[in-house]
Each structure stands twice: as structure tokens, then as C-alpha cells.
Amino acid sequence: MSESNAASVRTVACLLGPTASGKTAAALALAARRPIEIVSVDSALVYRGMDIGTAKPTREERAAVPHHLIDIVDPADAYSAAGFRADALRVVAEIAARGRTPLLAGGTMLYYKALTQGLNDLPAADPDVRATLDAEAARDGWPALHARLASVDPATAARLAPNDAQRIQRALEVYLLTGRPMSALLAAPPRNDDAAAGLRFVPVALEPSDRAVLHARIAARFDAMLEAGFIDEVERLRRRDDLHLGLPSMRCVGYRQAWEYLEGVTDYRMMRDKGIFATRQLCKRQLTWLRAMPARIVVDCCAQDATARAVDALERVLDGRTPA
């Protein structure tokens, strides 16, 4: 990179990590030292009214440090990686224009990938097509639509379970709107624009040296959520007539398990066990994404001084003391 190009590129520090790795503590510790504003990279925190089960920053924390892309979507509505990318780029520019420092923080790696690498040229959702597919699924069942998908896009069908309604619907929708298999569109180079050309994203990753430590934290945090009234939170959502388990919001970790408990499908102990297991599986997927990211700066989230180490790494990024 030439000196002139380097001067025109703004470095954006990114604090990434799996569930319960200490991202919030590190971000708030950095905020005590620098004029930062936190931009959430979390697909669950976007939903209003879903506070306990998403471990949303408290009102006090959000009052102390500006947070963005939290509580921006109703649980009945959809929010996409494309929407996140547009919102995040806009917010980062607005923060910089105020003379403050944006810090991206979260664990939704698909959002981070969309932001930093661009998007594939997939069509937007079409309500009419979705309504047609929903009607067909109600009549024939999702396994029948999965078989239909296999006939037009075998690669996508092979990686989806026959009852994965959301993804089967999306893959068929893409095919019906474009005439091309979604697998072919995803294999094409991502479409990038100039919106992120002036930004250099540098990830600092909180990762465990001992997964057992992280698993213990996950269990303790889930129990704390239950003590804080998580079941009551889900019951309030369940009483709404526009929410159901097929929505992306209700598939957030913990919410499906609590909903099924309230429906009488499971007992309390099974709900707790399944909620913790689902969170551990999410953690595993997050770590898989992170470890495929070669340029990241790794901080052991199990270390006693993990917060201080993360803050030091982020400050080195912000001060330009990392390789370009």
C-alpha cells in the first residue's frame, strides 16, 4: 500500500469472539480510556424486547457508552446481512464525522464477513414468492419442497435438512426469482462497492485456550438469565399473535428452547440442558469462523487478565502499531 493510499484509509478496530468470551467487558474497559462508540455485530441484539436472552448491554452500560445497531428491529420483522452492512458502514462514517472512534464488537461472523468482504448478488426477499412457498409447504410439507429444491439446486439441498423451512424457502425463492441455483450465485465472487474502500478492518479475537472454561461460563450465564426472568420475557413474546418459531428472531439461541418449554414440549430441566447445549454449539460455530480468519490478533479469553490484554490489543490497532 502506498503512503498516499495508507493515509486515506481509516483503521477500524473489531472485537470479535464467541458467546461468553468477555467482549462487553473489554469494550467497556476500552471506552473508559478512549472516546469510542460501540457498533454491535450481533444478529440477536437487533431485536427489540429480547433483552435477557440475548445478554443485551444494560441501560446503564448503554447510557455510559453510545451503542449502535441494538433494538432496531421488531422481532416479527426480518433483518439481513445486507441490511447490517449498509447500517454499519453508515454508522461508522457518522461516528468518525463526530470525531469519535468506532469499535465493532460482536460474534455474528456472517455479518462481519458481509461487512468486510462484500455480498453475493442475491435478490431481496419477495413477499409474494414466500407466500406461495408457504402455502405449498402447508399443503405438501417442507420435505416435499426440499425434494423440489434437490431437483434444481442439488448442492444447496444436500447441506440442508428436509425440515429446515427458512433455508429451503430462501433457496427456492432465489431460484424462482433468478432462474439460477443459489449455490451458483454464492460461488461467484462477492459484489463489493466503494463504501468500505476507505476502511481497514482489523479483528481482535477473544478465543479460549480451554473450552471447558468457556462452557462453564455459558452454563453459568444461562442460569443467570433464567434467574433474571428469561422465561417471563419469552412468555411476553409468545403472547403476541404475530410471532412464531419459524421467525429468525425466535430461532435465536435459548428462545426456541424456552418457547418449547412454555408450550409443554419439554420440562424445565430439559429446556435448560437444551439451551446450554445450543449455546455451546453456537460457540463452536463462532470459533470455526474465527480460526479461519488468518489476520486476526488472538487474545486468550480464559486468561485472568483477558480484559486488559484485549484493551491493549485494541489500542495497538487504533494507534497503528500493527502490521498493515
Curated annotation (Swiss-Prot):
Transmembrane segments: none
GO biological process: tRNA modification
Reaction catalysis annotation: adenosine(37) in tRNA + dimethylallyl diphosphate = N(6)-dimethylallyladenosine(37) in tRNA + diphosphate
Molecular-function annotations in GO: ATP binding; tRNA dimethylallyltransferase activity
Cofactor: Mg(2+)
Keyword Transferase: yes
EC numbers for this chain: 2.5.1.75
Tagged with keyword Magnesium: yes
Gene3D superfamilies: 1.10.20.140, P-loop containing nucleotide triphosphate hydrolases (3.40.50.300)
Sequence positions that bind ATP: 17-24
Region: Interaction with substrate tRNA, residue numbers: 42-45, 166-170, 251-256
Stored InterPro entries: Dimethylallyltransferase, IPT, P-loop_NTPase
Site residues by UniProt (Interaction with substrate tRNA): 108, 130
Residues annotated to bind substrate: 19-24
Pfam family of the protein (one): IPPT
Keywords: ATP-binding, Magnesium, Nucleotide-binding, Transferase, tRNA processing
Subunit structure: Monomer.
Protein family: Belongs to the IPP transferase family.
General function of this protein: Catalyzes the transfer of a dimethylallyl group onto the adenine at position 37 in tRNAs that read codons beginning with uridine, leading to the formation of N6-(dimethylallyl)adenosine (i(6)A).
Protein name: tRNA dimethylallyltransferase
Species for this entry: Burkholderia thailandensis (strain ATCC 700388 / DSM 13276 / CCUG 48851 / CIP 106301 / E264)
